[in-house]
């Protein structure tokens, strides 16, 4: 979907090869058993266009959801995720929380979807 002031850009990033050879249990990267990553960027300039583009994005994601595994690449944050911890880190999240507690007990590094202290 494109317009004078709006744009949607779906991108399919290929995975495989070295990414998939590394054991998934040995890192917090939950995307080791997939062939590709889907990224969808949407752009707008005002609140009305935002509503239009988010509606388009919701419809697009509903269309492709049957082909997705429920995980989201951590470097493409989605503020509307209901369970970002599971989507970004899957079963590695509790271990990441322990690491967070050991190295950042004061929660200096935090944002809306950062790893929470246990």
Task: Tell what function each PLM region has.
Residues 1, 5-118:
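Soluble FAD-dependent oxygen oxidases
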